Amino acid sequence: MKIPAPSRGGRRGRRDRAAADAPARQVDYRRLRNPFPQMKLYSDDEIAATHDAALTMLEDLGMKILLPEARRIFAAGGARVDEAGEMVRIGREMVAAALDSAPRSVLCRAARPDRDVLLEPGMLVFQPGAGAPHATDLERGRRPGTGSDFRELIKLTQHFDVLQMVPPLVEPQDVPMNLRHYFTMEAQLTLSDKLPFIFSRGTPQVMESFEMLRDFRGCDDAGFMNESHCYTIINTNSPRQIDIPMARGLIDFARHGQLSIVTPFTLMGAMAPISVEAAMTLSHAEALAAITLTQLVRPGAPVCYGTFTSNVDMKSGAPAFGTPEHFRASLAAGQLARVVDRPWRCASGSAANINDSQAANETQFALWGCLMAGATVVIHAAGWLEGGLTVSYEKMVTDMEVLQMVAELCADTAPDNPQVSLDALAEVAPGGHFFAAAHTMARYQTEFYEPLVADWANFGSWTDSGAKTASQRATGIWKDIVSRDAALVHDAARIGAMQDFIAARTAAGGALPES
C-alpha cells in the first residue's frame, strides 16, 4: 500500500474552506436512552427478600394515611383500615394487582410532539433542581426565591434540550400562596414548551391548574384525561405516613389521568433506619403504597416509582448527598425498580453551600449512582445546592456541561467502517500528524463535543482573557440566556383567555393550599 506524504502546510486555509461547507453539529438530547449496563449491588435473592419485607411491612405494620377519602378508597379495595389510628394495612395481593395495572410506559404530552417525554425502563430524562426556597448567583447573592427568579430559571430550563421536563425550581415567595399556582402555571406555559409541573397543594389549586393547562393547550376534557399533559411529585412523610395534600394529589392526578412521580424522602439515620438495606425497605414499601392508591382510584393511571434516599451528618443531623451511601441506595433502588418493572425516579444533588468543587463532586457522584442504577428520571441534576434549599444559576450552567456530556454518550453514532479507518491511517506517515488529513478535515467541525463552560485555552491565553473561573464564565452564559425574549409563538386568543382566567380567579380570592 502506498502511503502518501503528509501535508506540512496550508492547514488554516483548508479548514477555512471546509468551514463554509461543513454542516452544523447536531446531537439529539431530547430523547435519551441510558447506554450503561445496570449495576447489581445486591444478589437477586437479597432484593427479593427486601421486596418481601416491604410487603410484610405494608401488611402487618401498615401506613398512616391522613386523608379520610384515601382511607375509604383503600378500604373499598380490601385493605384493613383502623379509622381511630388512621392506619391502613395493605395486603400484598392488592399491591400485586396495582403493579399489574400501572403502565410500564407513559408518554407525556408537551406543547409540541418533539418535546413529548417517554417514560419507561431504559429511557433517561433529566430535570434541574426543584422546590428550593432560595435562589443564588454571583451578582445578586443568595436570596428568597422570587417570581423573577422563577421566570429566569424557566428560561434556563427551556434553553437546554438535555433538560426535558420543567420542575418547580424555586418558590416565588413574593407571590401570595393563594395566587402562586396561577403565576407558576402561566410562566411555564408561556416561557417553555416542555412538560410542566403542578404542585399537589390541594384540590382547588390542582383543578385550576388543570383548567389553565387544558384550555391553553386546546384540549377537551376527554383528551386531557386520556393522556398525561403534566406531572406532580409526591413525597411521603417518612416513616410510614402519607399526609393530606400528598394523598389528595395522588387521587386528583390519578382520577384525571395525569402523572404522579412517587418519591419517599428517606434520610438514613433520621426519617429512615440508618442502614441502606433497612432504609430501602421503608422507601420501597412507601412507594408501593402510593402506587396502589393511584391504581385503586383509576386502574392504568400513570405513575412513576421513585426514591430519594441518602444519609445525614450524624454530628449535626444535616442532610448529605453525593455520598457512598447515597450511591448505594440508588443502586438498591434500581434493583427494586426492576422488580416492579416500571419507570422510576432517582436524584442527584449536593449539600454544598456554593458552586465549588464539593458541589461538583457530590452532584456528579450522585448522578453516576442514578445512571448506573438505570434511573428513568433524574431530578435535581443541575443547580441544586444546600440539600435543596437553594438553586444556583451558575451551578445550573456548570452542571449542564456534565449532563450534555452524558447525553453525548447516549447518542446514536455511526462508527467508521474498518476500511475508512485504514484509509485514514494510511494517509499519514509515521511520526506525522492528522490535523490536515482528509479524514480530519471532513469531520473536525462536527466530530467532538463543544464545551459549554470549560475553557481549554493554555494558561497564558486564559490569563489574557481575564483568568475567569468556571463559575464566572457561567455567569456570562446564564445572563445571556435570560436576557433574551422567549422564542415561542403563542395563540393571542389563548394568552388573552388565560389572562382573563387569572384575573377573574384573583378577584375571587384565588385558592389557598390545603393541608
Predicted feature locations:
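Structural signal for hydrophobic packing residues in well-ordered secondary-structure cores
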Residues: 46, 58-65, 78-81, 99-106, ...
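Helix-rich catalytic cores of soluble enzyme domains
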Residues: 141-376
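Short beta-alpha connecting loops at secondary-structure transitions
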Residues: 36-39, 315-321, 349-355, 383-395
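Glycine-rich phosphate-binding active-site loops on the catalytic face of alpha/beta enzymes
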Residues: 369-390
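N-terminal intrinsically disordered, cationic/polar leader segments
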Residues: 1-40, 45-47, 55-59, 65-77, ...
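Catalytic-core signal marking the mid-to-C-terminal active-site face
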Residues: 2-16, 20-29, 41-51, 61, ...
